């Protein structure tokens, strides 16, 4: 019987020693939003609570400044 090995999630920002998540770094922020434009929860990404709050704030600022879309579901 095959057992599935689930890889341990870790916070990328803690591992890299990031002080503050920058709202102008759109390439990084795009990794943490879905195709529909929603913010991916930390239980999926493994981001720590401190950086999840910074991430949410940075994504919301980038949306407000039109660096990121609020949604991609325009028809």
From Swiss-Prot:
GO CC terms, sorted: cytosolic small ribosomal subunit
GO process annotations (BP): translation
Gene3D superfamilies: Ribosomal protein S18
Keyword terms: Ribonucleoprotein, Ribosomal protein, RNA-binding, rRNA-binding
InterPro entries linked to this entry: Ribosomal_bS18 (IPR001648), Ribosomal_bS18_CS (IPR018275), Ribosomal_bS18_sf (IPR036870)
Molecular function via GO: small ribosomal subunit rRNA binding; structural constituent of ribosome
Family, per entry: Belongs to the bacterial ribosomal protein bS18 family.
Assembly description: Part of the 30S ribosomal subunit. Forms a tight heterodimer with protein bS6.
Function according to Swiss-Prot or TrEMBL: Binds as a heterodimer with protein bS6 to the central domain of the 16S rRNA, where it helps stabilize the platform of the 30S subunit.
Protein name (Swiss-Prot/TrEMBL): Small ribosomal subunit protein bS18
Gene symbol of the encoding locus: rpsR
């Amino acid at each position: 019987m095959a057992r599935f090995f689930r890889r341990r999630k870790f916070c990328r920002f803690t591992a890299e020693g990031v002080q503050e998540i920058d709202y102008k770094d759109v390439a990084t922020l795009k990794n943490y939003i879905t195709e529909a434009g929603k913010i991916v929860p930390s239980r999926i990404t493994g981001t720590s609570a401190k950086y999840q709050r910074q991430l949410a704030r940075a994504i919301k600022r980038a949306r407000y400044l039109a660096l990121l879309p609020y949604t991609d579901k325009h028809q």
